[in-house]
C-alpha cells in the first residue's frame, strides 16, 4: 500500500480514502495484475477475445494454450513480490470471515472459466483440466517462493506436460 501511495503521490491514508479500504487497494492491485497477465497471454495468442474464451467459444489449439500459459509463468517468475502478495492474500482469504474471501472465490471461478475456455476445443474434460492447471500454478509458485532456486518455468513445463498427457493431449 505504501509503495502504491508513493507512486500516486499520496499518503497511505490518502490512498485508502480514495479507494475505500486497504482491501480495496489490494484488490485493485490484483485486478491490475490480472489485466497484465491477460495481456502477456494475448501477446502469444494474438487478438484474443477473453469473453469468448471465458464462455468456451474460442478455438485455441493446445499449442497456443500451452504457449500462453508458459508465457504467464515465465512472466510471474520475474515478479516474486506480486506473486508473494497474491499467495499471502489468497491463503488468508480461505477463512470465510476474511474481507477478501468472496473476492478470491470469484477470481478463482473466473480463472477456472478462462483456463477451461483455453482448452475447450481440445480437452475432453476442460473443466477438470482447468482445475489441475490452476492448482499446479498456485502450488509451484508457492514452492518457488519458499525455494527461489527452483526453476519455476522448467518445472511448470514438465508438470503441465504430464497433466496434459493424462488428458490425452500433447504439444
PLM regions and their residue ranges:
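Hydrophobic/aromatic-rich alpha-helical bundle segments in the mid-to-C-terminal region
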Residues: 97-106, 120-171
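Amphipathic alpha-helical packing segments from all-alpha helical-bundle domains
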Residues: 38-39, 62-67, 78-82, 97-121, ...
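Short helix-capping/turn signature of helix-turn-helix
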Residues: 19, 88-96
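Conserved acidic functional residues
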Residues: 23, 33-34, 138-142
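Generic hydrophobic, amphipathic alpha-helix propensity
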Residues: 4, 29-33, 37, 115
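Helix-turn-helix
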Residues: 1-28
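Hydrophobic alpha-helical connector segments
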Residues: 28, 41-82, 129-133
Amino acid at each position: 500500500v505504501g509503495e502504491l501511495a508513493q507512486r500516486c503521490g499520496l499518503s497511505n491514508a490518502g490512498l485508502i480514502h480514495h479507494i475505500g479500504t486497504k482491501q480495496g487497494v489490494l484488490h485493485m492491485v490484483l485486478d491490475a495484475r490480472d489485466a497484465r497477465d491477460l495481456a502477456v497471454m494475448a501477446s502469444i495468442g494474438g487478438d484474443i477475445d477473453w469473453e469468448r474464451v471465458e464462455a468456451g467459444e474460442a478455438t485455441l489449439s493446445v499449442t497456443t494454450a500451452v504457449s500462453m500459459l508458459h508465457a504467464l509463468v515465465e512472466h510471474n517468475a520475474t515478479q516474486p513480490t506480486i506473486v508473494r502478495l497474491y499467495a499471502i492474500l489468497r491463503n488468508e482469504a480461505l477463512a470465510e470471515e476474511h474481507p477478501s474471501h468472496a473476492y478470491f472465490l470469484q477470481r478463482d471461478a473466473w480463472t477456472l472459466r478462462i483456463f477451461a475456455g483455453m482448452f475447450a476445443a481440445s480437452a475432453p474434460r476442460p473443466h477438470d483440466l482447468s482445475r489441475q492447471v490452476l492448482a499446479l500454478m498456485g502450488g509451484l509458485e508457492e514452492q518457488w517462493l519458499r525455494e527461489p532456486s527452483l526453476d519455476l518455468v522448467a518445472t511448470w513445463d514438465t508438470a503441465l506436460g504430464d497433466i496434459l498427457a493424462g488428458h490425452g493431449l500433447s504439444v
